[in-house]
Design a protein with these regions (language model features):
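Conserved PLP cofactor-binding pocket of PLP-dependent enzymes
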Residues: 194-198
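Beta/alpha (TIM)-barrel catalytic core signal, keyed to glycine-rich beta->alpha loops juxtaposed to Asp/Glu
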Residues: 1, 5-184, 189, 199-206
């Protein structure tokens, strides 16, 4: 798999590199935040999947046209950081000390102040998790899986027990009532802090 995490250029010609080589079975994906670019790219060469950040605390794809484009064009969507870079697991709070070299140290959402204010979102996940006999991480992933059948989150981990926990999310059933409750409660929570510092955010197309 060849994948570019950076924003792609705005011309259809620049999208000709977004190709599938069936003979070599090499898949090329790209990520973007632009509905019109997705449609134009798809017209030049059918797009297989888009990857973008999406989770309960990063919901841009719902409003920037990306999910609409995927549904209209039959494109798969692969959310990265579906657990909010670890925050939505419930394992962090304002007292959490990130180690040297931890990329999250430069992220506005991981300041102690932001972690404290965003705790309301984790509390919501913990409450639903208690009702479902699951973990906050499993609820966060189950919520994503329940959005659309063509959404496939990719939580990263280096620990076997976390992998098993993540896989368990597929067994969590969220009813329409559960999803409506999560939506209502999450809508009342204002997420504190941008995803990235300004200089990095500018490269994502938001």
């Amino acid at each position: 798999m060849v994948y570019s995490a950076r924003r792609v250029g705005h011309s259809p010609e620049s999208c000709r590199n977004v190709q599938i080589s069936r003979k070599s079975e090499a898949w090329t994906h790209f990520s973007t935040n632009h509905f019109d670019l997705v449609c134009r790219a798809h017209a030049v060469q059918p797009v297989t999947a888009l990857q973008n950040e999406y989770s309960l605390w990063t919901r841009g794809p719902e409003t920037n046209g990306i999910l609409d484009a995927c549904e209209e064009l039959g494109i798969g969507f692969v959310p990265y950081s579906p657990l909010g870079k670890g925050f939505l697991t419930g394992a962090m709070n304002k007292e959490t000390k990130l180690g040297e070299g931890d990329f999250r140290k430069i992220l506005p959402r991981f300041t102690p102040e932001a972690l404290e204010k965003n705790q309301a979102l984790v509390d919501l996940l913990k409450r639903i998790a208690g009702e479902k006999k699951a973990t906050p991480a499993q609820i966060a992933l189950a919520w994503l899986l329940a959005q659309k059948p063509w959404i496939v989150p990719i939580p990263g981990t280096t620990k076997l027990h976390r992998l098993e926990e993540n896989l368990g999310a597929a067994e969590v059933e969220l009813t329409a009532h559960d999803l409506a409750e999560i939506q209502r409660a999450a809508a009342a929570i204002t997420v504190e802090g941008e995803r990235y510092p300004a200089h990095l955010l500018a490269t994502t197309g938001r």
